[in-house]
C-alpha cells in the first residue's frame, strides 16, 4: 500500500464519517440525540485513530526508504511527495481528532445523558431481578406454611374439647355406677354404642356435605360446584348437630353431656311403678359434701310421649300424669279382656337409608284379591330384630321382684307381679311401634319427586328436626325400660347379642263382605277390580323405580 492510497482512505474517513457526524451533532436540538451522536462520534474517532496508527507505521517505513533512496540516487523530493511534510500534517490532524474526541466525551457528560448499557450489564440486572422474585416466592411459601400450622392448631383445640367431653361422660358413668351397681355393664355397653353412633353420624354428615339435603335425609341431588357453598353446608350441618345435642340435653336432663342418653336412661330404667307411669329422669349433680359419694339427684317431671312428640312444658306435668294414668289403665283393661291386634298402618315413606341396611319384616302372603293398600313399611336397622313374645318370657328376674326407685317415686318398695310386668311390656311395645311409624312419616320418600323446598331448612326454626329428636329420645327411653324388664339385656345395640325372639306374624285385616268380593255379571262392582289393578300397578312402579336400568337409545 502506497501513500496515495492511504491518503485517500484518510480523506474518505474524514469527509464521509467524521464531518457528517459532527454536523448531526451540531444540528440536533434534542439532548438525548446529541448524547447518542457524541457517543457515535467518539467511537468513529477511535476507529480513525487505528487507521492513523497503521498509516503512521507505514509512513515511518516509507520515510526511511525514501531517505535512503534519495541519498543513494541524489534525486530531489517535491513538497507534496515529501514524507516528512505528509507526516507532520497527519500528526496535526491526529491531535485535532484527539481533542475533538475529548470534547465529545466531556460534552456527553455535561448534558447528563447516560450512555447505553452493555449487554453484560443487562444480563446481570435480569439475574438480580430473578433472584428477587425467587425470594418473594419463598416468602409466600412460608406464609402458607404458617397458615397450615394455624389450622392444625385449631384442630388440636377441637380434639381437646372432645377429650373434655369424654371425661365428663366418664364422670357420669361413675355417678351412675354409684347409684345402680347392677347396671355397670349396661353403662359400659351403652357408652361404646354411643361412640359407634357418633362415628356413623359423622360419616352421614360428611356425605351430606357434598350433597344437597339435610342431615337426616341425604339425597342423590346434584353436587354443588361452589366450594363456598360446600363450606356453608358444613357450617349448617354443625349447627344442626348442636341443636340436636341441645334438644337431647333438654329432654333427658343428662347434665349437658352429648350422646349420653342411653347411659342415664339405663341407670334409671329400674324405676317402674305399678301404675305404669314413665320413670322420672335424674340430673346428677356433683356435690363433694354429699354422704353418698358426691351424688345428688334432682327429680323433674317426665316428658309425655304425645302423638306429635313435642316437648311438654313442666307446668302441665300433673295433668299429663293423670291423663296418662287413665289412658294406660284403660289399655290394660282392654288388653286383659281381648287379645292384642295388629293395628293396620297406612303405607308410609321409607327411610332414605342404604339398601343393605333395609330389611323387610316377615309378612303373610295373601291372594291378590285380598290384598289391601295398607302396607307396613320397613323399620330402621336398629329396630329390625323381631319383637319379644311376652308369653315366652320365663326370666327368673321378673318373678315377684320388689323394684324400688332411686328418684323418690311414690311407689317405692311396691311389688309388681309378672302379669303386670307383661302388661307393661305390651304397652311399651305398642308405644315403641307407634313412635317408629311416626318417625317414618316424618322422613323423606326417595321414590317421590324431589321437592327442593324440603331442603331449605331454617336453622333458627328446626321444628321438624326437633320433633325427630324427640321421637328418638322417646324410643331410646322405651327401649331401655323394655331392656330392664327383660333382665338388663341391651336392645339391639350391636355390642351384646339380643334375645332369640320369635317373630310375630303381622296380621292383616281381611274384608269378608260377600257383596264386595262377589262380582255381578253386569260388572256393577268394578271398584274392587280397579283397586286390585291400582295395587298391582303401584307395585310394578315401585319395582321399576327400585330396579331402574340404563336403556340404550340406539
From Swiss-Prot:
Cellular component GO terms, alphabetical: mediator complex
Presence of the UniProt keyword Kinase in the record: no
Predominant subcellular localization, coarse grouping: nucleus
Keywords: Activator, Coiled coil, Nucleus, Transcription, Transcription regulation
Region entry Disordered, spans: 118-301, 330-381, 398-428, 483-524
Subcellular location: Nucleus
Homology family: Belongs to the Mediator complex subunit 29 family.
Entry protein name: Putative mediator of RNA polymerase II transcription subunit 29
Gene expressing this chain: med29
